[in-house]
Amino acid sequence: MRRSSWQKSKDLVTFPLRAVSLFEQDRFGLSSLRTERFDYVAAEVQGECLDVGCGRHNLFIRDFLNGRGKGIDVFAYEGLEQENIVEDITRFPFPDASFDSVTFIANLNHVPAPKRDPELAEAWRCLRPGGNIIVTMGNPLAELLVHRVVWLYDRLFKTHHDMDSERGMEQEEEYYLIDAEIVARLKKVGFARIVKKYFGTQWGLNALFIGWKDMHLES
C-alpha cells in the first residue's frame, strides 16, 4: 500500500484535482487524500502502533501496517469490533509501555479541548521509552474549507464522507488546531524533540508533528 516515487510525482501534480474530487479510494492511478495521509504517517511508525481515532474499518493498522498494532475509537464506526471501542478516551485499556508509536491522524482537533492533555498523557504512558507520537493536522484555512465542502457534498449527493457528522460533533471540538497548541500540548505531557514535516504531495497544506519519549526520562 506504500506509494512509489512515480506515484508521489503523479499525486503532486494532480493535488488540486484530487482535493476537490473527494474520492475515498484510489482511482485513475491517483492516490486518495486518505491514502496519502496514511502513507506519510506509516513512514514514521516504528514497531507496534496504537492508532487513536482509527475510524471505519481500522484501515491504517489493517492495510498500511499489515495489522501491526491496535486501532481504537470512541465511536462504533462500520467495520470496528468491540475491542476497538474505547468509551473513556482519557483511559486507554493498555498497560504502560505497550507500543512503539502512537498516531492521531487528522483527529486531535476533534478531541474536546479539556480532554486533549489527558488523552495525550495516555499516549505517553502507553509508549515504550524511545517511542514516538505522530499527529497530523492540515493548514487552518484548508481544514475549514474541506469540512464545509465535505458537509455540503454529503447533503447534495447523499454520500457519507463526513465521519464527524455521522457521530455528531461535541462541544469544544474544533475544525483545526494551530501549530503552537499542538507543540505546547505535546511538550506539556513530556514529549521531546518535536518536529514538523510537511506533506510534499499536498503542497504543504498538510503536515505531521513527531514527538519522542526519550529513553533517559524513564531511567
Regions found by a protein language model. Name each.
Residues 109-111:
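A short His-aromatic
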Residues 42-43, 96, 120:
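A short, aliphatic-rich alpha-helical micro-motif
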Residues 117-129:
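A short glycine-rich, Lys/Arg-flanked "PGG" loop and its adjoining helix->strand segment in the class I
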Residues 90-102:
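A short acidic, Gly/Pro-enriched loop at the edge of an enzyme's catalytic core
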Residues 104-107:
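A short beta-strand submotif of the Rossmann-like class I SAM-dependent methyltransferase core
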Residues 1-49, 55-91, 134-219:
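Class I (Rossmann-like) S-adenosyl-L-methionine-dependent methyltransferase catalytic domain
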Residues 47, 98, 130-131:
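Surface-exposed loop/turn positions
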